[in-house]
């Protein structure tokens, strides 16, 4: 699938939601990420929303006010669900139609004066929830730099295993411990074996670590035994989010052989509550990672000319630290790391 720009990406678009037009706004009208929220101190069920400025567009309210009457019934029904699963399952064409509709509704030149108080909820008045019911998830080892650095911790003489450059390496994670951002994480406990100890001990982890990752929500699925070709893979992708893959390195070092990590990884995974659609990311598409001349080329089923040309994403990712004590003392956050998602060895379509 080749990403295309359309009118929703126009840099000159402005919204009648004033906060969305601020230069440093995370949610301008060109973004329009999807999420699920619940009004604070309300017994109403969760609702699907779209972030715009410092507000959330309530899709259920839009349906009730007949602002989306031209949309297909299946899409309107999906907009009133309490999770994004039904909407994502409709596929990329439906997601694109909804994005276009919302973009037109929120434009300052739309010619409409919708009842703002009824369709918008202040971010401060909402609790952000997990955007979808996640029955399963796969954790890929897509950065060759990360794989090499972590490999050095456990295999200094052989950090990168020979299969890495041939097949996207992954393992299944624990879906039941996925939480949205803002939920406190408990320090895990398990077996750890200090280098100078003869036997392991059971204790709290002393090497709790973070991993900055990008999550990918799969929408429309496929039948068992029917593979999805690399050229059609992105038709099944709804959008991306941020992920913190919490890791207990001391537990991991002891337990990971021979089948890989388990308790060191399954205690918590944090997701950002907003999903940015692939269509919204079209202006940031990039070529796939350029392998060195010594590296093998992908096997035919993992190779596509269009994927090589635009399978990457030119997204800069950062990790900032601001502890409770730093906040109490009015200290500024400290940046721990910065990297580019375009440096992933494997593209999303290949994975």
Task: List the predicted regions and their residue ranges.
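Extended C-terminal subregions enriched in glycine
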Residues: 340-351
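Charged, compositionally biased non-catalytic regions
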Residues: 1-7
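Short, surface-exposed charged micro-motifs
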Residues: 48
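Active-site microenvironments in enzyme catalytic cores
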Residues: 8-42, 51, 57-334
